[in-house]
């Protein structure tokens, strides 16, 4: 067991060495990128040892040796939890980061600050591993905020672009909303249970726990881009493609789902929280799948597919199947990272062109990238015996065979079908047909720094699901028998999506252009969500503030109260004092009449 914990700590320690080295010589070392890549590879090999030992012995362990601080009766220690979730996630995250870093050496080779970029990527990975291995909420919060700030720095990497700065700020602001939920939950656990250690929280499980669990759901919704807090995820595509690949596969966006997986002992008997997560996930997975249908930016389509898959993971949490949700996190990481690397290969070769309408015919020019992209799209749809099938199919089976909300199930099945539609759309537009890019474009995919990472992720997208699914302990007894129509539900919906996509593609060649329909506008404008939430409230606030300032300050005080009132008083006074017309005869006559009347009145006998 000592060897077991030592290898886990060694894995984390290895990753810190490039950070220390780069602090002494940040920009001058030309071999720093390959050094970081090799360090991550060594950490990946090291992390396989405790994972294999755990699968062999099936024994969890904790390390809580380093005492930080004692606040009254709260004792904070540096504590690592080495259970199934952390030990399985570490090799997956390290393998994918290793591949992405090698790809970055090709994609970012002309960037003058590439060493700093690699340092940021490594810090992003380290903070995620801190979050995954944390055994108390304080340590988890450090990792949670770490992935947030690193995503801000990486999304806004090209800080000279306004869109990149806006997207980075949007990501951090939406995550602040989620952080409010996590902080509220931490405060509740501290005031009611006087502890932040996970095992003590689970042991002191009180009912009801609706307030802290709702805070955790809010935190997960912010970090994992659930409906309402989702707009930052497609906007994050303004960052470099390696950042998108790392962000969407094994780091930040799955942190929210991982938080709920960590706290599933508190949620497994709470029907209210399960229903909330189920409905939230179902709405997210369908809404983002609809938004993906009409996007033309290849990275935006893949980003919306990520959000849709995160909604599916949230549905799985709502079905009380945390191990299935974790399996989908791991399998999804492989093919999603590969999809982003393939799109990065296409974008880089087409001189930073991201519009799929300006691609086409790439199956001849980029045969290896095309093969990987098609296999990634098929794995995303849950095609049998690819990686996605081993997690997506059991999730749909669990949904159809559990006592769940039929409305949520219908939304999830519809989103599953739409996944096949937008995946087929990428294949049709980007890879098939005639080339629609300039003929002078030079295309080359023969660089080993491009081929090798995609090749590794391609192997993972085919075999990783089988390997990972065979290592999951069955916590809830699965159904041994199922009706045939329920067993084939997921495959049927995927096949239906492919058929719809093929039919639409054949029909569009003969259809005349008309004005966009309302469903098309809804999908293209992202459900009017950015218009309503990003434009309307600021416009109303600014116009109301302007009117209040104009009415109260300008018109009332600065204009009406002082200048106009003073002028009016002076006008009345001058009118009153200078109201003489020069009519002397009339004045004398009035005096005479007045005097005459007075004399008559005084001299009149009584």
Swiss-Prot record:
Pfam families, alphabetized: NADH5_C (PF06455), Proton_antipo_M (PF00361), Proton_antipo_N (PF00662)
* Entry keyword annotation includes Kinase: no
Provide the GO biological process annotations.
Answer: electron transport coupled proton transport; mitochondrial electron transport, NADH to ubiquinone; mitochondrial respiratory chain complex I assembly
Q: Which GO terms describe its molecular function?
A: NADH dehydrogenase (ubiquinone) activity
Main subcellular localisation: mitochondrion
The reaction(s) annotated as catalysed by this protein in its Swiss-Prot or TrEMBL entry are: a ubiquinone + NADH + 5 H(+)(in) = a ubiquinol + NAD(+) + 4 H(+)(out)
> Which EC number(s) does the record attach to this protein?
7.1.1.2
Report the membrane topology from the UniProt record. Multi-pass membrane protein
Asked if Protein transport is a keyword of the record, the answer is: no
Q: Which top-level enzyme class is recorded in the Swiss-Prot or TrEMBL entry?
A: translocase
State what this protein does. Answer: Core subunit of the mitochondrial membrane respiratory chain NADH dehydrogenase (Complex I) which catalyzes electron transfer from NADH through the respiratory chain, using ubiquinone as an electron acceptor. Essential for the catalytic activity and assembly of complex I.
Q: How does it assemble?
A: Core subunit of respiratory chain NADH dehydrogenase (Complex I) which is composed of 45 different subunits.
Name of the protein described by the UniProt record: NADH-ubiquinone oxidoreductase chain 5
This protein's species is Balaenoptera musculus (Blue whale)
